Swiss-Prot record:
Belongs to the bacterial ribosomal protein bL12 family. The gene is rplL. Forms part of the ribosomal stalk which helps the ribosome interact with GTP-bound translation factors. Is thus essential for accurate translation. One of its GO terms (molecular function) is structural constituent of ribosome. This is Large ribosomal subunit protein bL12. The lineage of its organism: Bacteria, Pseudomonadati, Pseudomonadota, Alphaproteobacteria, Hyphomicrobiales.
């Protein structure tokens, strides 16, 4: 049972982006599709992350709400910010609204928001 508790603890500490990547890897490994459960898990993870941010006000999440007309520029900027590969960045942009970066300082969140908006995206900071 201790091993299962460790797995649950490790999974609980994943960011939304890490959880999405884990989901894709498991889908490939097991040959299944988990489209609906992934959306529910991502929404639950985002809601869980939002509560501590409101209490502390020292960490913010940068949420991409819409890619806008210049999707290619937004994908390039997301890649630069997150270090994701082309496919992962494209999936994140096309799956908006999604968290681009979580638990960042207010200054970094403002900087990331400006970069993404300059690329043509609509961004929220929560």
């Amino acid at each position: 049972m201790a091993d299962l508790a460790k797995i649950v603890e490790d999974l609980s500490s994943l960011t939304v982006l890490e959880a999405a990547e884990l989901s894709k890897l498991l889908e490939e490994k097991w040959g299944v599709s988990a489209a609906a459960p992934v959306a529910v898990a991502a929404a639950g993870g985002a809601a869980g992350a939002a509560a501590p941010v409101e209490e502390e006000k020292t960490e913010f999440d940068v949420i991409l709400t819409d890619a806008g007309a210049n999707k290619i520029n937004v994908i390039k900027e997301v890649r630069a910010i997150t270090g994701l590969g082309l496919k992962e960045a494209k999936d994140l942009v096309e799956g908006a609204p999604k968290a681009v970066k979580e638990a960042v300082s207010k200054a970094e969140a403002a900087d990331l928001k400006k970069k993404l908006e300059d690329a043509g995206a609509k961004v929220d900071v929560k």
